């Protein structure tokens, strides 16, 4: 049985020095339903270089969120090439994918989740502490300040508005300093001014 920590080290070593990029080549994804096989992604090709920010637009149900899941290794493509942070995800098993995401990818889902029994500060800091980051509280405070929530550190999710909760989720992703950040409608619950500030951060 493989050692997850050793695998994580090997993955990190193989990724280091590469262009922290996204590369999709002729990606297809089909799912089986009661109605038969449904094609979700058809021949998607996309290249994103390190330092670039790319927005994907399209109609509801067009596959945007699914493509993000494929890039993060949360969905397996039926065919094609999927490289994230310079690493071919098709060669990783599920345990290796989990380690890979932890070390390289930050995700803000459209339907994000905060732990209701933790404060805003704890929701950002605790995942960092689990990852062994020693300055987790300071980093969490800095990111919450960056999204305009420095006055809400001790508030629980139930005490925050929907937009404030979304900013906590964004701060949590920013604080991890991932090589690649994937965000699904990250400003959907924010007003124009706050949304613009968040886009500047991105």
Annotate the PLM regions.
Residues 19-22, 26-202:
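ABC family nucleotide-binding domain
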Residues 1-30:
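ABC-family P-loop ATPase nucleotide-binding domain
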């Amino acid at each position: 049985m493989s050692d997850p920590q050793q695998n994580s080290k090997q993955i990190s070593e193989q990724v280091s020095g590469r262009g922290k990029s996204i590369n999709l080549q002729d990606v297809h994804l089909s799912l089986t339903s009661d109605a038969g096989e449904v094609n979700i992604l058809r021949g998607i090709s996309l290249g994103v270089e390190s330092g670039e920010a790319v927005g994907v637009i399209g109609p509801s149900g067009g596959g945007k969120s699914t493509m993000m899941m494929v890039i993060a290794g949360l969905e397996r493509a039926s065919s094609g090439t999927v490289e994230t942070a310079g690493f071919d995800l098709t060669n990783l098993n599920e345990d290796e994918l989990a380690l890979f995401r932890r070390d390289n990818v930050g995700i803000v889902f459209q339907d994000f989740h905060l732990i209701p029994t933790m404060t805003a500060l704890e929701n950002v800091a605790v995942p960092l502490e689990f990852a062994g980051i020693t300055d987790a509280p300071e980093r969490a405070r800095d990111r919450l300040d960056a999204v305009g929530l420095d006055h809400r550190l001790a508030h629980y999710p139930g005490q925050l508005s929907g937009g404030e909760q979304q900013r906590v989720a964004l701060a949590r992703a920013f604080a991890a300093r991932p090589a690649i950040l994937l965000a699904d409608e990250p400003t959907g619950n924010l007003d124009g001014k706050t949304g613009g500030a968040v886009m500047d951060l991105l």
